[in-house]
Amino acid sequence: MGDMANNSVAYSGVKNSLKEANHDGDFGITLAELRALMELRSTDALRKIQESYGDVYGICTKLKTSPNEGLSGNPADLERREAVFGKNFIPPKKPKTFLQLVWEALQDVTLIILEIAAIVSLGLSFYQPPEGDNALCGEVSVGEEEGEGETGWIEGAAILLSVVCVVLVTAFNDWSKEKQFRGLQSRIEQEQKFTVIRGGQVIQIPVADITVGDIAQVKYGDLLPADGILIQGNDLKIDESSLTGESDHVKKSLDKDPLLLSGTHVMEGSGRMVVTAVGVNSQTGIIFTLLGAGGEEEEKKDEKKKEKKNKKQDGAIENRNKAKAQDGAAMEMQPLKSEEGGDGDEKDKKKANLPKKEKSVLQGKLTKLAVQIGKAGLLMSAITVIILVLYFVIDTFWVQKRPWLAECTPIYIQYFVKFFIIGVTVLVVAVPEGLPLAVTISLAYSVKKMMKDNNLVRHLDACETMGNATAICSDKTGTLTMNRMTVVQAYINEKHYKKVPEPEAIPPNILSYLVTGISVNCAYTSKILPPEKEGGLPRHVGNKTECALLGFLLDLKRDYQDVRNEIPEEALYKVYTFNSVRKSMSTVLKNSDGSFRIFSKGASEIILKKCFKILSANGEAKVFRPRDRDDIVKTVIEPMASEGLRTICLAFRDFPAGEPEPEWDNENDVVTGLTCIAVVGIEDPVRPEVPEAIKKCQRAGITVRMVTGDNINTARAIATKCGILHPGEDFLCLEGKDFNRRIRNEKGEIEQERIDKIWPKLRVLARSSPTDKHTLVKGIIDSTVSEQRQVVAVTGDGTNDGPALKKADVGFAMGIAGTDVAKEASDIILTDDNFTSIVKAVMWGRNVYDSISKFLQFQLTVNVVAVIVAFTGACITQDSPLKAVQMLWVNLIMDTLASLALATEPPTESLLLRKPYGRNKPLISRTMMKNILGHAFYQLVVVFTLLFAGEKFFDIDSGRNAPLHAPPSEHYTIVFNTFVLMQLFNEINARKIHGERNVFEGIFNNAIFCTIVLGTFVVQIIIVQFGGKPFSCSELSIEQWLWSIFLGMGTLLWGQLISTIPTSRLKFLKEAGHGTQKEEIPEEELAEDVEEIDHAERELRRGQILWFRGLNRIQTQIRVVNAFRSSLYEGLEKPESRSSIHNFMTHPEFRIEDSEPLIPLIDDTDAEDDAPTKRNSSPPPSPNKNNNAVDSGIHLTIEMNKSATSSSPGSPLHSLETSL
């Protein structure tokens, strides 16, 4: 009975302990004793408490705290406790220094190759062959004027200097983003609060301020912030799997197992505990420190302690370590604010055991694209070097028949080094260094801005995944409605009151039952407080439905607090707390005569079925038959529900003193044979902005579904008010039990085919359990009923919503009403619990994708042109027209700036005027491909014209076939300058990727873009006019500058011409991808595929969607590339482990599998809107079409599970993980 009989106790000596604590720093129990006690489990712990301290109140006395009043809150006392018992904080690892980040940036293989080549070039440039031998070395050394040989070192030095610049820029980016992340992290941590009792007042304090001796209130959904011992509990069940590996919920009670451990989840019930260990001394903290999260000193110190403990309590530690290996969730202690945690092994275990996302949509596609670009670049650079070396060797030793002289060897080697540098230049050009940075910047920028739109992003990839969302499964309460509940109708003493009745109209005994039942059978943490501002609304604290009932008592001019003062929470004999399965709450009171009375409240149809009597008009109980119940349902409950009211039934039952005491653990026998007191109708108004937000979603091709625990009539009424349902539409509204009946076969197994028949038309799922929600979400995601497979976002607030939130592509948790467990399972937290914030998330998600596409269009144009120019130029003229240092400026510096410029475009409402991208849409739409090839054609024509005819046009010396270490030529400077200016003006073109004509639209709204374009132009002037030998530049005249600018601006005019050409006419673009039928794609690749987005298309045909299909079949090639890419980025920082769920902005992680997902990179479908006017206009106004998932324009052929994948430092987006 001890777990039920939470009766008041005379706390001898405890009440005075508050005063003692302020004067005496010596506690009656040491830190070591508390740690040893918390190591024990269940009966061992209970025995130790009884033997050493008597009971939990004895521990409270020794800790100088009151079980009822808590700590005094005196600052001196709190400081003393922190000094003795520690702070609720795990010191994070020191952030990497700037020099460490510089060293890591230097590990890039491309840069290492350039460094080696530059050093060799530098060393050889100082060698001069004997004068007499110069002629014998052939033409290779002819043409060097006096003194020019001495400047040969400049090129090598300039390359080294460029590498230093690149490294510093990279390191600074990483450093600033890590700093930004830590700032955001600390801000999030400051917002984490927990409820404690101090000075007799229930207050919320930051988790870090909790100290030993605090009396903490725990409730359903909490993640425990510290270790403690239960003082009083109501039906308390804890999920300890994070520490023990046991999946069953553990029932906690004073007489069986009173220990509560940090990092565990409260799955049911409520209670109070005295905090006994915090921070590194708590059970989760000990594990953190053993893993090194607390720093090296802590680790060494705790390793010694661990060894000692192993001898004494080997079993306990072994058990915990085994549990840790089984379930990495031990690392998820929310309140312990470790920003980095765990060594690599534990991190890998955690990832292996905690299902989270695979590669996100964008990451998957960019990974594949980077692999293919890397392959092409490697091939082109190798061919370039081979051709140059062969040409030189054949020309020198075969055609000119020169002998190989030992004295000439250094000169020959210089040539080979020069060829090698040209080859590396081609590789540098081909590898899109700016791409990971563009993703990082775009996501970081979006995440920062989304916080202002009430979206707190925990997983960065969720930000862009929202751009793909085709379906949103939303809760009703608080998300679509205001969560400001009030009782507006009631059925009492056989009368249906359309407004709250006067207390005089209710018989006194019914009023008494009503007041006592509501006061004690609502959580004592639910209360109504006076308004913060004069004239404002009273504040509702705790469960909003219970607050509505308490407000109902206040409307009846009765004060619930008087009843609670008379019957404190400790006097409650037994509480059956509310959960999603029972959908009711019951409280048992023991009367002085030995009799019991139970009060119940819950969903009206559930409680009414358990009622055998009802209080009549005169206040007497009369028999309540099934037909009477049916009458009430038809005349009272259904009319209330059809007005959108939530109906709650209140009832009671007496257990006379003479009868045997019931078996309290058998709830079904206890909560039955009730007497109905009243049925109340609670109004929760729809948020005024929600109907418009839902209309925007439907216009954007997103289907909104309501999943709620309310009855079907209430749900249907609210759905109609919101605009989810429209009169006359053929859509389904189902209750959970009906839904389950339809989707299961005779054996009770769920069948996907059955779900597929329901979900396309389903709009409302009422009376649903969290399991139903998970089943629906999984069913929609896994469905292949149409090619347009779904990307699903889900909102959730309850502990049991965790599975659905994790299964969804994007899980939204409620910041206000959500439990810690729901927040932990989510990807994004809605800080205002408002549906309109989800719409903003969709807008930001689409904007991220657009930003990356813009940069991709710009980057690929630069890459195509530069690779062809470097390759062709090198093969024809024996030298690259664009020198290594110039290419470093173009590719590493300018692209970095361009990624910043294009990735920070603010979103516009027009993003919501088109359908979602979908999972399998190609990354490069045909419009983008048209722009890339069109602009590349213009730029190549200009560059090659200047290269082979420029000297005649400008009447200057030709720069072609210049000897080694020749001075910079005006000719090649004009080529370089024109090339850069064409990229600069093409950056403006790249702002639009849908074929819009006005590329300047909104340009001044983006100050970053304007600043960067102007800044790049200024730097280009400095490089050309003053760069000299290091940049291989010669000063240009005003005329030459004007011609360069004119040719650069030509890209804007050329862009208008390209926009005029209808994409649908360019059939040859189709040849870029070979059609692969759906059935040809191997199942395992289907399972790994990820979402695709393309802006240019409305639909995607089944065939002809895959590019480089052959590459996917050659597994060994991909392994080679993986190895190459791993080495390419091996020096980059490993991502911080998600050791604490405080790390809300944890990093997106992915790896490149041997079996690459089949993702089309080039779109080759015909359906395309070429005119910007079409593209920006809203789709056809058919509500069915807008609101039907089948027409949402998504083509999906794969499953994307939210499961963790280990991070690969070789991934091209790895910088994303390391820098945020």
Swiss-Prot record:
SMART domains: Cation_ATPase_N (SM00831). Its EC number is 7.2.2.10. It is an enzyme of class 7 (translocase). Residues 297-356, 1162-1220 are annotated as: Disordered. Catalyzes the hydrolysis of ATP coupled with the transport of calcium from the cytoplasm to the extracellular space thereby maintaining intracellular calcium homeostasis. Plays a role in blood pressure regulation through regulation of intracellular calcium concentration and nitric oxide production leading to regulation of vascular smooth muscle cells vasoconstriction. Positively regulates bone mineralization through absorption of calcium from the intestine. The active site is at residue 475. Belongs to the cation transport ATPase (P-type) (TC 3.A.3) family. Type IIB subfamily. Monomer. Dimer. Oligomer. Calmodulin binding. Interacts with PDZD11. Interacts with SLC35G1 and STIM1. Interacts with YWHAE; interacts with the monomeric and dimeric forms of the YWHAE but prefer the monomer form; this interaction inhibits calcium-transporting ATPase activity. Interacts with NPTN; this interaction stabilizes ATP2B1 and increases ATPase activity; this interaction controls T cell calcium homeostasis following T cell activation. Interacts with EPB41; regulates small intestinal calcium absorption through regulation of membrane expression of ATP2B1. It is found in: Cell membrane; Basolateral cell membrane; Synapse; Presynaptic cell membrane. The chain crosses the membrane at residues 106-126, 155-175, 367-386, 419-439, 856-876, 883-903, 928-948, 972-991, 1006-1027, 1040-1060. Residues 1100-1117 are annotated as: Calmodulin-binding subdomain A. The gene is Atp2b1. The modification Phosphoserine is found at residues 8, 17, 338, 1140, 1155, 1177-1178, 1182. This is Plasma membrane calcium-transporting ATPase 1. The modification N-acetylglycine is found at residue 2. It comes from the Eukaryota. One of its GO terms (molecular function) is ATP hydrolysis activity. Mg(2+) binds at residues 475, 477, 797. Coiled coil: none annotated. GO terms for biological process: calcium ion export; calcium ion export across plasma membrane; cellular response to corticosterone stimulus; cellular response to vitamin D; intracellular calcium ion homeostasis; negative regulation of cytokine production; negative regulation of cytosolic calcium ion concentration; neural retina development. Residues 2-105, 176-366, 440-855, 904-927, 992-1005, 1061-1220 are cytoplasmic.
